[in-house]
């Protein structure tokens, strides 16, 4: 079984808790592959710098661990095919050869969904091997806006410049 989103159901009950309950009642589940998020590795119960969705991933991991369900956590960074890097970036790439994103001094290492899929498939083929493990998946390099622009330039075979934009302007 693969769990992707720990979204809330009926207030305080979460999909994660319902899945754990069903898995324990069924009793024959080999593994739950939980698709989490890389930020979870830096979080604590009292940390405040992350989004609501990141907090839900953090809590979902703990619920799965506490439940006794056989689980493997997959923690990818942002997906390379995330709309942030595709749909939202396309107009400026097409019209001005610019990658315009609200990155500031930030860096990221986007990962291809196909790489994540291969990891999940490997876990599902041999689930007993990884029970209790956490796989943190990243792309090949940690890039700033200029590095992302360089990668786009290689793929598009034309010069692309990276341009930071304030988040307030971008949204």
What are the roles of these predicted feature ranges?
Residues 5-11, 22-31, 38-161, 165, ...:
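Oxidoreductase cofactor-interface core, primarily capturing Rossmann-like NAD(P)-dependent enzymes
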